[in-house]
Swiss-Prot record:
Annotated family: Belongs to the RTC5 family.
Keywords annotated in UniProt: Cytoplasm
Subcellular location: Cytoplasm
Region called Disordered, residue ranges: 166-201, 332-359
InterPro entries for this protein: TLDc_dom
Disulfide bonds: none
Protein name, entry field: Restriction of telomere capping protein 5
Stretches assigned to the TLDc domain: 370-611
């Protein structure tokens, strides 16, 4: 204990946790913000900050009012009568925890000072990648700790219990300072704190940020004090309020008006929001719903099926980086006052500068959706990726084009083929229907699939080396949006699947099959042997009449297949085992795994075409890319025009085999049956791979 306790010995120095936290905040500010952003942040913070004993800080009311978040009190209180969007207390608890980073175990809840606010903005926006060593994984741990509010012991008790064990290894605090520790300047930052990679191993969470501050030993001390953060849980009510806020603010654009999404919501809109929120909560285990959400369940849910859930926090907290009070023309205005002939400089508007809308625009034309609504679109944005550069569909300015609706175009495979097979771009298939339980009660269900390749006969996935980690936006996805949120990611071994396992299969005899094994064509194939068979982690079959859809989800893998089972992401699958090995290993898994089969009476079936923004199209326009130089809508219309001209040309064929009108109609009937003219020209076998 001798030398390590001395604060005056050679090679020793004393640094408080508070001082290190401030120094780290300044490092964050210099690394993650521009000088202009810092100027705006300082103006926003100090113009509203309270002062107590020389400490400038924000309280919950100031934070909620600035962000426009309902908090059950103040000006943002009267947003909804049921208070379901009153997430102000939840957000304030999160920022109070994150403001103490990386010493949240000894300092949290922290006072929301300017330094704390700097760290909060970095950690709650996409700037976190510059300071967290393991990026998204570390951020999930921090977010869980900031939300956990059930079963957490009092921090003072934890400090007292840890004091005796930590005294010798860290150094006893000097008189009058309960958070001052000593450590050697020659401490090796490469020395591991733990050898295991367990979920509770957070010791390297912020080592990269602290190495240059010579604060590694203090950080390790802080981490040893409270490993019980993973023993605490997130209450269902806390997570429900946060989900509701994220659901309504998902389309929020940078510098957009937050109140537009949180105020004036009708009861019908709130009902759709609650439906999607409860669907996500239903994906958790029953034990989580009763006693709170544990870290393992939270981490698995976010990493495997809701990777973009917290994306709305980025534009929300980046509002702090724009101040309405700053007038950059003020200096020029003061100089012009001495010149009588100079025109007065107009005052800037009180609202932030406008920016292009970022919500996926549902293009007009075709039909009005009976499935899509703002809440469901937000739900899709939490897990659906349409671009490698900017995965979130709200951020990358994806546009949705109405391609097919069974309500508008009829429940016919001929009509489906005419509208869908001519769409040369990615698409989303949505189905809304009812599942009848054993008690004859109908439960409304919404399922769908993301198909990154066009529906066309000659389509196939581009060749990919098995060592390559596939981009999520290039893999298909099968999902259930309600009543239980379920996501089945595309397999990273997709390129190595056999030809009889196409992503999508279309036949006028068997209907539509997604993620199924297709039996070889044979005249002897009758009954069940002729139908596509479910494979992999899940499959979807739709009958030729577009009346019944069968969703099959497997607990394991029914051999190799297009989709992975629920709870497994393509990234983790490709990381744990190579694509070739994964495909080979799945064949050894018994096909007797328990399958959950849902027979859904279809109320409505819709196909929506995905059109990337023009800027992303330029980036993605490369060999093997789905983006063509010609707009997908223009391509489809050109195809329809060509088919119409061909139909007109065929009409001039002399169908008069006799001299009477009856013979003319008979001749035309023969041509229609042959598929040369009429609607039947769209029938036949279509095979998508």
């Amino acid at each position: 204990m001798g030398a390590s306790q001395s604060t005056n010995g050679p090679g020793q120095k004393t640094t408080s946790v508070e001082e290190l936290s401030k120094r780290l905040a300044y490092r964050f500010a210099n690394k993650c913000f521009t000088p202009l952003e810092l100027t705006h942040l300082k103006d926003n913070f100090f113009s509203r900050a309270l002062d107590q004993g020389g400490i400038r800080y924000w309280n919950e009311e100031i934070l909620s009012e600035f962000l426009g978040i309902p908090d059950g009190a103040g000006s943002a209180a009267y947003v909804t009568s049921d208070g379901s969007l009153d997430a102000g207390p939840v957000i304030f608890r999160m920022v109070s925890y994150l403001g103490a980073f990386p010493f949240q175990n000894t300092m949290a809840p922290s006072v929301l000072t300017f330094e704390a606010m700097v760290k909060v903005i970095v950690l709650l926006t996409e700037r976190y990648g510059k300071v967290l060593r393991r990026g998204r994984k570390d951020r999930v741990k921090l977010l869980y700790g900031s939300l956990a509010d059930v079963g957490r012991r009092d921090i003072i008790v934890q400090l007292q219990e840890a004091a005796e064990d930590s005294m010798e290894s860290v150094g006893e605090a000097g008189p009058g300072s309960d958070r001052t520790f000593t450590h050697s300047t020659g401490f090796s930052v490469d020395k591991p704190a733990h050898d295991d990679d367990g979920e509770e191993d957070d010791d390297d969470l912020a080592l990269a940020a602290l190495e240059s501050l010579d604060a590694i030993e203090i950080f390790k001390h802080d981490q040893r004090i409270d490993k019980t953060v993973y023993e605490s849980k997130i209450s269902i009510n806390t997570f429900r309020r946060l989900l509701a806020l994220l659901m309504v603010t998902a389309p929020l654009r940078p510098l957009g008006t937050i109140s537009k999404y949180t105020t004036g919501l009708s009861s019908s809109i709130l009902e759709t929001v609650h439906e999607q929120v409860e669907s996500i909560l239903a994906a958790l285990a029953l034990d989580d719903l009763e006693g709170g959400i544990g870290y393992k369940s939270f981490s698995e849910l976010i990493s495997t099926s809701l990777p973009y859930l917290f994306d709305p926090l980025t534009p929300l907290f980046e509002h702090l980086l724009f101040s309405k009070n700053l007038d950059l023309t003020r200096k020029r205005h003061s100089q012009s006052q001495n010149d009588p002939a100079a025109k007065p400089v107009p005052t800037p508007p009180s609202t932030p500068p406008s920016s292009p809308p970022l919500s996926p625009v549902i293009l007009n034309g075709g039909f009005d959706s009976s499935i899509l609504n703002p809440a469901l679109l937000s739900h899709l944005s939490f897990f659906l990726s349409t671009s490698a550069q900017i995965p979130n569909i709200f951020r990358n300015r994806t546009r949705l084009h109405p391609v097919f609706s069974s309500t508008e175009h009829g429940e016919s495979l001929t009509s489906f083929s005419h509208h869908v097979m001519t769409w040369q771009a990615p698409s989303i298939l949505l189905i809304k229907g009812a599942v009848t339980s054993e008690s004859d009660e109908e439960q409304i269900t919404t399922i769908g699939a993301y198909l990154p390749q066009p529906w066309k006969q000659s389509s196939s996935y581009s060749s990919r080396r098995s060592s390559d980690v596939p981009d999520q936006s290039t893999l298909p996805c099968l999902f259930e949006l309600s009543p239980v949120h379920t996501v089945l990611q595309g397999s990273p071994s997709l390129s190595s699947l056999k030809p009889n396992m196409p992503v999508t299969y279309f036949s006028t005899k068997t209907g539509i099959a997604i993620g199924c094994q297709i039996p070889p064509p044979s005249r002897k194939s009758l009954g069940a042997d002729f139908l596509p068979k479910p494979s992999g982690g899940g499959s979807l079959l739709i009958d030729p009449a577009l009346e019944v859809a069968t969703l099959v989800i497997s607990d394991g893998l029914n051999g190799e297949g297009v989709f992975l089972p629920p709870g497994i992401s393509a990234h983790s699958a490709s990381k744990s085992v190579s694509c070739t090995t994964l495909a080979a290993s799945t064949t050894s898994i018994s096909a007797s795994n328990h399958n959950t089969t849902k027979s859904i009476s279809i109320y409505s079936l819709e196909v929506w075409g995905i059109i990337p923004s023009q800027s992303l199209s330029a980036q993605l326009d490369s060999p093997g890319s789905f983006v063509d130089k010609q707009d997908a809508i223009t391509q489809q219309r050109a195809q329809w025009d060509f088919e119409a001209r061909e139909a007109e040309r065929r009409k001039v064929i002399n169908m008069k085999v006799g001299v009477g009108e009856l013979e003319e109609h008979s001749g035309r009937a023969l041509l229609e049956m042959a598929g040369i003219v009429g609607d039947s020209q769209y029938s036949g076998l279509r095979h998508l791979r």
